[in-house]
């Protein structure tokens, strides 16, 4: 729902209301994207910004009324009155099944792209898609980019997501990944679900965003506003 706040008969602010992960939320419409609203206004860090506003990497994929959509190219106003589901809003069973499958198959390293991939897979799964078919999985993955893991282990996880996997030694897996990459790595279900601890996800409250403009910098309270101010 789109609401207008009026003072003295003059409309001064638009409010976008929608359902996010089962809760009704209100967001000021600044003309930006759904991704900006989720991250900058609502503090949803599981939805990643990999290429905005290009809509090419799939890291910000969410479900809008049950269908996978890329949040960085979805204007906020288009979700008024609709239902938005992030990886945080998936059922506990869906989160567990998919994160366990990804961990068991080594289908993630940094975990930046996996929340969006999991959201898309779940969206297709809920609509009855057969994810045991490679062509179905590959079609879904065509909307995503993964720079470090590659597709084979993700295909394996998707094909066998319904299987109860044996436990994996996560400490040993993290140690092996650290040796392979040369930097500390954390392997576990929380990484698959977008809780890997990226710098952009742990910025202090009320931080400003700086954007280059000519020979200087422009600062604002959100990336959208900073880019707009920078021209």
Question: Which residue ranges define each predicted feature?
Answer:
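Short, Lys/Arg-enriched N-terminal segments with co-localized hydrophobic residues
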Residues: 2-12
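Cofactor-binding beta-sheet edge motifs in enzyme active sites
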Residues: 11-19, 24-29, 44-45, 144, ...
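Glycine-centered loop/turn positions within well-structured domains
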Residues: 25, 58, 70, 108, ...
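A basic, amphipathic helix-loop patch mediating RNA/tRNA/ribosome contacts
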Residues: 29-64
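Ferredoxin-type iron-sulfur electron-transfer modules in oxidoreductases and energy-metabolism complexes
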Residues: 31-45, 73-177
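Solvent-exposed alpha-helices and their adjacent loops that cap or buttress functional pockets
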Residues: 54, 102-105, 140, 184, ...
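Glycine-rich phosphate/adenylate-binding loop and adjacent beta-alpha elements
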Residues: 62, 67-78
């Amino acid at each position: 729902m789109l609401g207008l706040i009026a003072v003295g008969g003059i409309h001064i602010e638009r409010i976008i209301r929608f359902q996010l992960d089962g809760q009704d939320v209100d967001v000021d419409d600044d003309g930006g994207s759904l991704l900006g609203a989720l991250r900058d206004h609502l503090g949803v860090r599981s939805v990643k910004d990999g290429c905005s506003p290009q809509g090419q990497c799939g890291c910000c994929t969410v479900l809008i009324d049950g269908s996978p959509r890329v949040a960085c190219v979805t204007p906020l106003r288009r979700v008024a009155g609709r239902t938005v589901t992030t990886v945080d809003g998936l059922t506990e069973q869906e989160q567990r099944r998919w994160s366990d499958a990804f961990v068991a198959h080594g289908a993630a390293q940094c975990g930046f792209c996996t929340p969006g991939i999991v959201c898309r897979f779940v969206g297709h799964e809920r609509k009855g898609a057969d994810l045991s078919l490679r062509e179905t999985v590959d079609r879904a993955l065509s909307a995503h980019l993964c720079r470090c893991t590659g597709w084979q282990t993700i295909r394996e996880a998707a094909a066998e997501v319904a299987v109860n996997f044996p436990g994996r030694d996560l400490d040993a897996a993290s140690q092996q990944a650290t040796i392979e990459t040369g930097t500390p790595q954390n392997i576990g279900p929380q990484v698959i679900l977008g809780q890997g601890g990226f710098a952009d996800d742990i910025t202090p409250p009320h931080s400003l965003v700086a954007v280059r403009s000519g020979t200087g910098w422009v600062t604002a309270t959100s990336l959208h506003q900073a880019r707009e101010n920078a021209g």
